[in-house]
Amino acid sequence: MNQSIDDKVDSRIKEDLSPTRNLTGLHLKIVASIAIIWSLFQLWYASPFPFWFNIGMFKGLPARAIHLGFALTLAFLIYPTFKGKKISIFDIIISFVGAFCCLYIYFFYDQLVDRGGVLLNIPVSENFNLPVELILGSLGILILLEATRRAIGLPLVIIASCFLLFSYFGRYAPEIISHGGLSLNRLVGFQWLDQEAIFGIPIGV
């Protein structure tokens, strides 16, 4: 009897201290399935099979976008907003939105390359009909910051946010580090649609 109580107490303590959800049943199967599919995708992409069979070949940026899409989906299903909280409708919705923001790059990569980012150079102040890339890119950045907060913690989010703010408000910084500042279009376009920012070397590796 005492052993059973001790086990329950230990289980509750581990659940409270763990940053991840204690998934069971259908939720566990869904998360495990997504993780397995992600792993298979990574193995396929890194293998010579796409070149041998001439199928399933991915360019660099679309492949990285798919990778981040899987990561964001799992992040919101595994890491709760608050410790011990079960998967909510909000978690499911935000995971799908985050994945869509990434997969947009995969599905419309050729159009993005053909347009050369022309839409993203339209100043926001002159056009209230924001380009879809600007909307999805902004959402993607915010969702990525929230996923980072859940999985790693607030300090890294604060650091990343400071650099984003510095990029936008650079003209107001001390003279020694000041710059002209990026428009919202250019900032989002660079961060979300370029291989030198979010989809850079860390994801590529």
Go through each PLM region and give its residues:
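Conserved, well-structured core domains of diverse proteins
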Residues: 1-128, 134-138
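Hydrophobic transmembrane alpha-helices of multi-pass solute/ion transporters
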Residues: 53-60, 118-205
